[in-house]
């Protein structure tokens, strides 16, 4: 990955492996995977690529993926593709490809610039919020369907209204709680159950207000709870 998020459990796992990073997926394995998944499906297929940072595998990998989907989709199934990216280094060519092939792209942005940069520096320790925000705008300008994923840690939970205001313009948002590691140690960014509940309550109030004012924002788990 080209970022070093403070809460990343993959980074800790890499340090403990004999081989830090496994070899990239071979073309043969990609071919077999796509073929078997499509042949086993009844009506629809969804491929999702996520971190580390999946875009680092390069554009040719995704181009080959789409070629294989077209080759093996002899029953005209509905096939969708999605990528979860940190949004730090997407080329114009990759963005154009995602638009052309109708990829759904999730971008990680932890609320405000302050809360994001506190937790999500690049590999050299530099802030990344401004670059990520620019990437989101580039994706949207290209016509790519985008949603924003925000990790709720202790710092984010203390600023629910600021975080909502920062993310609401992107319209489609997901929140996931930042859990402590299995070692049981708490950290300066740890999220308590009480803090998460308070965050969700105020976020719901803002979500409801935006809806009543004709400015609806989609927050996936709130949508799901309401639909239950």
Tell what function each PLM region has.
Residues 52-53:
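Active-site neighborhood of divalent metal-dependent phosphoester/pyrophosphate hydrolases
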Residues 21-25, 57, 123-127, 191-198:
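Alpha-helix N-cap and loop-to-helix initiation/capping positions
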Residues 185-228:
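A C-terminal junction/extension of Radical SAM enzymes
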Residues 12-16, 114, 180-183:
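A short, flexible beta-alpha/helix-coil linker loop
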Residues 1, 5, 49, 83, ...:
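Conserved, mostly hydrophobic/aromatic
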Residues 30-48, 57-178, 188:
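Radical SAM/AdoMet-radical enzyme domain recognition
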Residues 1-25:
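Canonical Radical SAM [4Fe-4S] cluster-binding loop centered on the CxxxCxxC motif
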């Amino acid at each position: 990955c080209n970022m070093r998020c403070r809460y990343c459990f993959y980074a800790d796992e890499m340090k403990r492996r004999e081989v830090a990073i496994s070899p990239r997926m071979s073309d043969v394995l990609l071919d077999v995977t796509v073929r078997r998944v499509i042949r086993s499906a009844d009506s629809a297929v969804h491929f999702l690529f996520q971190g580390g940072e999946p875009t680092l595998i390069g554009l040719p990998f995704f181009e080959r993926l789409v070629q294989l989907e077209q080759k093996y989709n002899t029953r005209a199934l509905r096939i969708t593709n999605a990528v979860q990216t940190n949004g730090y280094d997407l080329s114009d060519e990759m963005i154009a490809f995602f638009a052309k092939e109708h990829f759904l792209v999730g971008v990680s942005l932890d609320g405000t610039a302050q809360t994001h940069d506190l937790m999500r520096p690049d590999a050299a320790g530099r802030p990344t919020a401004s670059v990520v925000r620019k990437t989101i705008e580039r994706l949207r300008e290209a016509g790519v369907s985008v949603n924003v994923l925000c990790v709720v840690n202790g710092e984010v939970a203390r600023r629910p209204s600021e975080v909502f205001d920062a993310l609401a313009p992107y319209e489609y948002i997901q929140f996931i709680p930042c859990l402590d590691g299995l070692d049981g140690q708490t950290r300066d960014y740890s999220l308590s159950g009480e803090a998460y509940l308070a965050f969700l309550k105020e976020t719901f109030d803002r979500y409801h207000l935006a809806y009543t004012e004709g400015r609806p924002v989609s927050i996936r788990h709130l949508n799901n709870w309401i639909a239950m």
